[in-house]
């Protein structure tokens, strides 16, 4: 009788302040894109699990919203609670910081991490953007004094530099356990959720600085069609009439571009043809209303 192969499985939280590259790191660790990215802070609003299975190892990464001090709006409070609760019951935390920058938000995150029982790996992202490399070593020494890190790894998530080192450390700290997900799973999120995230990413990419924090997307219809693809109806919610005009653009040009780009990404992700229709609606005060936020899928509970 042959011996049953041991399997290893663990949860790894990716945390840090907004806009340090957490989602880019997750996508690179998975080898494909499941978490939306942009150059704007607070792109990630929900916790997203990314699942990477390789042989006997299954790493379940939890990409969290950026932790930040500002909590004036209900959406910011929910994002902070979602990020904080993600680090409570994991095998390993990857704390992502940006180059030689250190802010009050970074300090707040490390204060939360000091009380954890699990090991914390520090990933210094965007080191390729540090122009004065002589500042890097002193900064690494400064960071190493903040708490007892498992290891400190300089990386460039965007270029894939040293991401394999992160993955290797993750494997070494996975407990022996059954896999939680089938080996072909890459995320715990539904196709409907991923469709809304793709549309939101395009909104952030093609619109101005102010709008992204006042916009969300609700998928009203996601149904298979007779051609083997999907009919998807997306409702874009904004807070003011002026924002609605901004999303639609001159003679509908902006929403058309957003729709084309989103449809292409959906077809690549779902491996099927997509018929996408988008509408824009004004819903005043949605980002300040916790009940409305929860109805739109914002939550501080792991799903």
UniProtKB/Swiss-Prot annotation:
Report the SUPFAM superfamilies cross-referenced here: P-loop containing nucleoside triphosphate hydrolases, Prokaryotic type KH domain (KH-domain type II)
Name the segments for region: G3: 63-66
Q: Binding positions for GTP?
A: 16-23, 63-67, 125-128
Q: Give a single Pfam family match.
A: KH_2
Which intervals of the chain are annotated as region G5? 155-157
Membrane topology note: Peripheral membrane protein
Report which superkingdom the organism of origin falls in: Bacteria
Q: Where is this region: G4?
A: 125-128
Region G1: list its residue ranges: 16-23
UniProt-listed GO biological process terms:
ribosomal small subunit assembly
Could you name the Gene Ontology cellular component terms for this entry?
A: cytosol; plasma membrane
Which stretches are annotated as coiled coil? none
Era-type G domain ranges (all copies): 8-176
Which Cys-Cys disulphide bridges does the record give? Answer: none
Cellular location(s): Cytoplasm; Cell inner membrane
> Which parts of the sequence are annotated with region: G2?
42-46
Which InterPro entries does the UniProt entry name for this protein?
A: G_ERA_dom (IPR030388), GTP-bd (IPR006073), GTPase_Era-like (IPR005662), KH_dom-like_a/b (IPR015946), KH_dom_type_2 (IPR004044), KH_sf_prok-type (IPR009019), P-loop_NTPase (IPR027417), Small_GTP-bd (IPR005225)
Q: What does this protein do?
A: An essential GTPase that binds both GDP and GTP, with rapid nucleotide exchange. Plays a role in 16S rRNA processing and 30S ribosomal subunit biogenesis and possibly also in cell cycle regulation and energy metabolism.
Family the UniProt entry places it in: Belongs to the TRAFAC class TrmE-Era-EngA-EngB-Septin-like GTPase superfamily. Era GTPase family.
Assembly description: Monomer.
- NCBIfam families noted in UniProt: era, PRK00089.1, small_GTP
What's the protein here called? GTPase Era
Q: Which organism is it from?
A: Yersinia enterocolitica serotype O:8 / biotype 1B (strain NCTC 13174 / 8081)
